[in-house]
Amino acid sequence: MGGKGGKGGKGLGKVGAKKRHSRRVIRENIQGITKPAIRRLARRGGVK
C-alpha cells in the first residue's frame, strides 16, 4: 500500500501577480473561466 501523495504545485507563484490594479480585468477573467480552464486549475491543485 505504499504510495506517495503527488501534489502538483510547480509554477504557481507567478499566478495573479501581474494584474494588481485592474479589478475589471479580474472580473472578466472570472467570467471567462471555461470548463477547460477549470480542468486545468483542478489538475494543478491535485484534483483529478
UniProtKB/Swiss-Prot annotation:
Domain of life the protein comes from: Eukaryota
Subunit (UniProt): The nucleosome is a histone octamer containing two molecules each of H2A, H2B, H3 and H4 assembled in one H3-H4 heterotetramer and two H2A-H2B heterodimers. The octamer wraps approximately 147 bp of DNA.
Biological source species: Blepharisma japonicum
Task of the protein: Core component of nucleosome. Nucleosomes wrap and compact DNA into chromatin, limiting DNA accessibility to the cellular machineries which require DNA as a template. Histones thereby play a central role in transcription regulation, DNA repair, DNA replication and chromosomal stability. DNA accessibility is regulated via a complex set of post-translational modifications of histones, also called histone code, and nucleosome remodeling.
Positions with biased composition (Gly residues): 1-14
Main location: nucleus
UniProt region (Disordered), positions on chain: 1-23
Record protein name field: Histone H4
Keyword Nucleus appears in the UniProt entry: yes
Gene3D superfamilies tied to this protein: Histone, subunit A
UniProt record similarity statement: Belongs to the histone H4 family.
Tagged with keyword DNA-binding: yes
Origin organism lineage: Eukaryota, Sar, Alveolata, Ciliophora, Postciliodesmatophora
Molecular function terms, GO-annotated: DNA binding; protein heterodimerization activity; structural constituent of chromatin
Cell location: Nucleus; Chromosome
A single Gene Ontology CC term: nucleosome
Keywords noted in UniProt: Chromosome, DNA-binding, Nucleosome core, Nucleus
